[in-house]
Amino acid sequence: MLKNVYIVGGNGFARECYYNLLRMQKSDSSIQFGGFLGHGGYGHTVDYKDLQKYYVGEVSEHVFKENEYVVIGAGYPELRQKIYADLKKINVKFFTVYVGENLPDSVEIGEGNILAPPFLCSCNIKIGNANVFNGDVVVGHDSVVGDCNFFGPRSQVLGNVKIGDFNQIGANVILLPKCKIGNGNKIAPLSAVYKGCRNNSYWAGNPAVKIGNNE
């Protein structure tokens, strides 16, 4: 059965999702691109540049069919959370973007994730829903990732790390073994987190220290 996949969102990240879908199509002919859908003003008629012709309207105007799925084409955790929650209310089915070899059997992964290539992971990992691993991200053994997190390019989650929800992990960040990250945090690029952080804070440096709140 064909899977008609829509991308909800706009700007550069939605376009990146489109090209990763094209990569997936090369090995799975059941995947078809339905078009771009806006969400509450995010994603509209000026956001898609050379892909503008694929914009088909707003989510609120679209009636989803049985074979239709959604990719959340937004990077920021707060926006992903909002789109994910709104679409769950109308029972939309979510599509996970993954270009690569089969994941190990011991990896548990939820719905609506984006695993941009290359994505490298070890074993006994749990990943929740609607996360973004935005290229060359490494996740180590026995790590747990919640929902709606963003991992910047070349970030590394080492073994036994626990991560909550709605965190923004910058490019080239290293989360060292057994550290614990709460909810709603922002970690600046190139930072190294040794023990972890609680909730709604902003961290930077090596070793990373709290430099403010993420409100």
What are these regions (language model features)?
Residues 1-74:
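A solvent-exposed beta-alpha-beta segment
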Residues 1-3, 31-33, 65-67, 91, ...:
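A general structural motif
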Residues 9, 70, 94, 140-141:
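Generic structural signal for conserved hydrophobic packing positions in ordered secondary structure
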Residues 14, 42-43, 79, 103, ...:
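Flexible, glycine-rich phosphate/dinucleotide-binding loops
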Residues 18-20, 82-86, 198-199, 215:
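Short amphipathic alpha-helical segments
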Residues 55-108, 112-122:
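Compact structured core domains
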Residues 96-211:
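Structural signal for interior beta-strand "rungs" in well-ordered beta-sheet cores
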